[in-house]
């Protein structure tokens, strides 16, 4: 457990590694502010909808995340599981470029980030870039659909098949292409 830190998130990632080691094919770890009544990534600085602030990010959440995620990746690598395990850490949107009156940041769907590791992907690859304030993508915007297509393709599912609607229109099963930049 020391490798993952002492946080709830670290304990959940350790359990995830144990599940993967036992053959589980997909594990999801979610952190919401209702989880164990503690601060999480919902950073509005408002006790009614997301109590965390940027100071909580700096002092607690980011160090816990860094320790736990790096512990998971190191542990998977030491056990020979990292090449066969795809780890994705992301939220469903970004955060406003400007701090609100409560020292938090609100929802911002136009610009977001994520981490994809393991799975025989090229390490250190960066796909896309934002402007200096993380307001807008300025190079190679990535959509959540592309991340979904990447996960599905990595799992060996063909993302090209078409589905037929009631009116006989053929639509792609997943209308996005995988992030091929992640494979060297």
Predicted regions and their residues:
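Ligand-binding pockets and gating/stacking loops
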Residues: 1-184
């Amino acid at each position: 457990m020391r490798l993952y830190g002492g946080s709830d998130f670290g304990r959940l990632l350790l359990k995830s590694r144990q599940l993967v080691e036992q053959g589980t094919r997909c594990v999801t770890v979610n952190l919401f502010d209702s989880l164990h009544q503690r601060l999480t990534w919902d950073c509005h600085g408002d006790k009614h909808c997301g109590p965390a602030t940027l100071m909580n990010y700096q002092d607690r959440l980011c160090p816990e995340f860094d320790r736990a995620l790096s512990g998971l990746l190191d542990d998977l690598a030491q056990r020979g599981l990292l090449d066969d395990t795809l780890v994705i850490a992301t939220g469903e949107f970004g955060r406003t470029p400007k701090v609100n009156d409560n020292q938090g940041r609100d929802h911002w769907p136009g610009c977001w980030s994520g981490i994809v590791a393991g799975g025989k992907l090229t390490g250190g690859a960066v796909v896309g870039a934002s402007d200096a304030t993380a307001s807008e993508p300025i190079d190679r915007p990535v959509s959540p659909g592309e991340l979904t297509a990447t996960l599905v393709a990595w799992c060996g599912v063909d993302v090209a098949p078409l589905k037929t609607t009631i009116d006989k229109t053929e639509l792609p099963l997943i209308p996005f292409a995988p992030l091929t930049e992640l494979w060297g």
